[in-house]
Regions:
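Core AdoMet radical
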Residues: 1, 12-29, 41-65, 71-106, ...
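Radical SAM enzyme core and accessory elements
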Residues: 186-265
Length: 265
């Protein structure tokens, strides 16, 4: 941090984009200190992007937004955009990201949009997204209807490691869920962009082609049961209560795990 403050005077006039990430920047006093500095030392050509999980208190978000809104209105910065992670909606999303509360997250996200910032959703598309991702897409449409199509964007990179989170370990019958979600985007192109469609189609094609080796799929299925059974035990959660449609797959993974365990005793 000290090195940055010393560097900033020479950096300020030539820097066009600054991304503040973490950790959680809104828990770091240095982030607000930087926005305070911009009040006295404007950078009207500067675009600032900030990463946050939006799980912090309302007060922290409100203080940031008030400062950012002031900087934009006074043209002391050029633009502010926001990146945050979410992979579905409701109890499924909360299961995937321990500690996430969708109502809390949504309230904070809306305050960011109201300040004039673009919110970019980073969706890490994983094994648990396939049957319920449409829930998030419905919310995206809702937010775009309320705040404008440009207010919220989303990206869908698929997760490749660790194997127990890969979509490729799912049986073929899950492809129907993936195709249904792609069709939902196609049927609602008034609210989605061509880029969003193509990126999700890429995920769908990757799931269908499944270039992953049989050995890695076997490893992923074994680890799926190992990880989520232990995760549920430690956190007091229950995967099959939240994702009942995964019951047959879960039992398949359990059998693989138990057979592997028995062979190695």
């Amino acid at each position: 941090i000290e090195a940055f403050w010393k560097w900033w005077p020479s950096l300020r006039n030539d820097l066009h984009t600054l991304r503040i990430t973490g950790g959680e920047p809104l828990m770091n006093p240095g982030a607000m200190q930087f926005f305070d500095l911009l009040e006295d030392e404007p950078a009207p050509h500067l675009e600032i992007t900030l990463n946050s999980n939006l799980g912090v208190t309302f007060d922290r978000v409100d203080r940031l937004i008030a400062r950012v809104k002031s900087l934009i209105e006074q043209k002391k910065i050029r633009k502010f955009s926001f990146f945050t992670s979410i992979d579905s909606w409701g109890e499924q999303a909360e299961y995937m990201r321990t500690g996430l509360k969708c109502d809390h997250w949504e309230r904070n996200m809306k305050e960011v949009i109201k300040a004039g910032a673009t919110v970019n959703l980073m969706c890490t598309y994983n094994v648990l997204c396939v049957t319920n991702f449409q829930k998030l897409l419905h919310k995206v449409i809702e937010w775009r209807k309320e705040y404008g199509k440009e207010a919220v964007s989303f990206d869908t990179p698929y997760l490749k490691e660790p194997p127990h989170w890969m979509i490729n370990i799912l049986p073929e019958e899950f492809i129907k869920h993936q195709e249904d979600t792609l069709k939902f985007i196609e049927d609602n192109m008034d609210w989605f962009t061509g880029v969003e469609y193509e990126k999700f189609k890429r995920v769908t094609d990757y799931m269908k082609e499944n270039p992953v080796s049989d050995l890695k799929i076997l490893q992923g299925r074994r680890d799926f049961y190992s990880f989520f059974s232990e995760n549920d035990r430690r956190l007091g959660t229950n995967l099959l209560e939240v994702f009942p449609e995964y019951s047959n797959f879960y039992n398949l993974c359990k059998n693989i795990y138990e057979n592997y365990d028995n062979r190695n005793k």
